[in-house]
UniProtKB/Swiss-Prot annotation:
<protein>
    <recommendedName>
        <fullName>Structure-specific endonuclease subunit SLX4</fullName>
    </recommendedName>
</protein>
<keyword id="KW-0227">DNA damage</keyword>
<dbReference type="InterPro" id="IPR018574">
    <property type="entry name" value="Structure-sp_endonuc_su_Slx4"/>
</dbReference>
<keyword id="KW-0234">DNA repair</keyword>
<keyword id="KW-0597">Phosphoprotein</keyword>
<comment type="similarity">
    <text>Belongs to the SLX4 family.</text>
</comment>
<feature type="region of interest" description="Disordered">
    <location>
        <begin position="239"/>
        <end position="260"/>
    </location>
</feature>
<keyword id="KW-0233">DNA recombination</keyword>
<feature type="compositionally biased region" description="Polar residues">
    <location>
        <begin position="295"/>
        <end position="307"/>
    </location>
</feature>
<dbReference type="GO" id="GO:0006281">
    <property type="term" value="P:DNA repair"/>
</dbReference>
<dbReference type="Pfam" id="PF09494">
    <property type="entry name" value="Slx4"/>
</dbReference>
<dbReference type="GO" id="GO:0006310">
    <property type="term" value="P:DNA recombination"/>
</dbReference>
<feature type="region of interest" description="Disordered">
    <location>
        <begin position="281"/>
        <end position="330"/>
    </location>
</feature>
<feature type="compositionally biased region" description="Basic and acidic residues">
    <location>
        <begin position="1"/>
        <end position="10"/>
    </location>
</feature>
<keyword id="KW-0539">Nucleus</keyword>
<dbReference type="GO" id="GO:0033557">
    <property type="term" value="C:Slx1-Slx4 complex"/>
</dbReference>
<feature type="region of interest" description="Disordered">
    <location>
        <begin position="1"/>
        <end position="75"/>
    </location>
</feature>
Amino acid sequence: MDLRRAERNLKILGDANSDEDMPVAHSVEETQGQALFSESDEADAEEDAAESPQSGVGGRTTTAESGGEEHREQVFLSTQVQGRIDEFEATEGARRQFRQLVTGFTYAQEDGEANAGGRTAKRVPKVRRTRRNNTKVRSLTEFNTENFERLRKEDRARSLLTMLSGKTQKVNNLLRGLQQERSRERAFHGCSVYNEGEWREIVRLLHERLPKATRSDVACIKSYVYGDGLDETPWCASHARPPDCPAQSQERQGTCGPGDDELRIFTLSQLLEDQSASEDVIPDSMDAGDAVSLGSPQPQAGLSQHSFCPDSTATSPLRPPATPLTRAPASPLPVRVYTAPASPLDYIPDSEDDPYVLQGPSQARSPPSLLEVRRTLKNIGVRPGRSAAAVRKAAAAVARIEAASDAASLGTASDADRRSALFLRMTALVRRSPRLLAHIYCLRPVALDDLRAVLEADDDFIALLDDSLIRQWADFTGICVKNDTSDSQRPPQPLESQ
């Protein structure tokens, strides 16, 4: 739009300059620029340019050729075009200044002066190679192997000092300080050492716990326990056989002679059959091979002669001991016994010969209230009616079922007994229906409504039972009960007509 206005203005100015006979009009055109560039003139110029673009171009060319250098200095531009050009230049100048400001912007220094220089690349610290630490533990197994003795001594010293002094912190600080001095590290200033009194107490306890014994005392004790002619160590000598033991008992293995001085091994069946001790074959103990015999016990060896001492106090399962083992009689102590005189009415003869069971006297008891009966019926799974007559009728039916099942009465029986009586009643009703029984034996599911209908047909009392009680009875007896009566496994006819 600005280019068109500029072209139109140039055209008008060229026409005005080419007309030399009208100086007044030329001055008017120069002084009244706003009137010449009105909206009506602009619209007319646009229409003329649209109708004859070729003529306009030819006119501009003719005007440019006819005008001279003397008229070019007097070219007048529209104030609107000049204003737009000024705004564009101001915008470009502001953008240029802003770009320079952003380019030269930096953070202020500590002294408050801004750094006018450009951005500098961030310096990356140079990676320095660390020295290899030769004291670093590379293998835990190697460390434990090399320092096993030292660690064991330190642990023993720590445990011993802790047990004697009872001060764990002091012991740990002391050992830590010694370890740091050994490794030539900096001096340890945080340990708390023992004073003179504490060291004296530790030494006294050491003498009490570890009494000093001379070598002669140790040799005397060794000769008394193991004998004078002990050539081997006590551990090896304790496993050696007695020197006077016959060698033939060691050589023969599995042979059993008829001697009376040898012990025999018997099985339980031989003992029950009362067989003699001279039997050579023991068929129940082994399938093949010779019988196993035990040598006769040797006389007791003294402690000063032998290292093996058989125990003659062991009891044998075959023969009773010669001297029965009894406890020493305890000293008699006076004991006061209180006896209460029993009345002849409280005396009950205790005899196993009585063919009947003794029963105590029955005590009179008040009948249960209506609320208790209702609560009892709800606990066992019976739905009592709202009226008192319905509750009494249901209670009488339950009592009748309990009497038929040899259970206790409603007032004295427990809820489990009453529930068991109801289970027995429903089981008896199922056994009366051969069709239902065959249906159950075939492991076919039975609808709950059909099962209720069959049971209620034989006994009206089943209508008072809850569904939960019937399901519990079905789970107890192994009957598969289903809710959906439209199942495909449901028989096409009712159970009574099958």
